[in-house]
Regions:
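Intrinsic disorder and flexible/low-complexity segments
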Residues: 1-119
Length: 119
């Protein structure tokens, strides 16, 4: 299965396409988006997007009513319908994160008196 993100300003965000066809946003949520981001090699997700946020999509959809647990390694492992009732303004999308969810990066800056911790 080939997953791509289309229409976003960079490689970590866009409308989700599976084998060249869009995914419908009916029931689309953060768990679904997490599976997509993980499948694309990103460690986490910032947001699941709806309503073709990254541009209108073709009206022939690959998946509808996607329902993931967040533990799947592939979007195709998630429950979904193949028959859709979606329009070009119902593309599902993601904004993937380059950092693990909940992790803060800590930087210690050494000064003359004492270190400064920057989060």
């Amino acid at each position: 299965m080939n997953i791509t993100l289309v229409g976003g300003p960079n490689a970590q965000q866009g409308n989700v396409f599976v084998n060249g066809m869009p995914v419908c946003d009916d029931g689309w949520d953060l768990k679904d988006a997490l599976v997509v981001c993980n499948q694309l090699g990103f460690p986490s997700v910032l947001r699941a997007t709806e309503s073709s946020e990254f541009g209108r999509v073709p009206t022939t959809f690959r998946m509808d009513d996607v329902e993931c647990t967040g533990e799947e390694t592939s979007l195709l492992e998630c429950k979904h319908d193949r028959i859709d009732d979606c329009g070009s303004n119902e593309g599902a999308g993601v904004i993937c994160s380059l950092d693990y969810a909940g992790n803060q990066k800590l930087k210690i800056v050494q000064g003359l008196a004492r270190p400064i911790f920057i989060f």
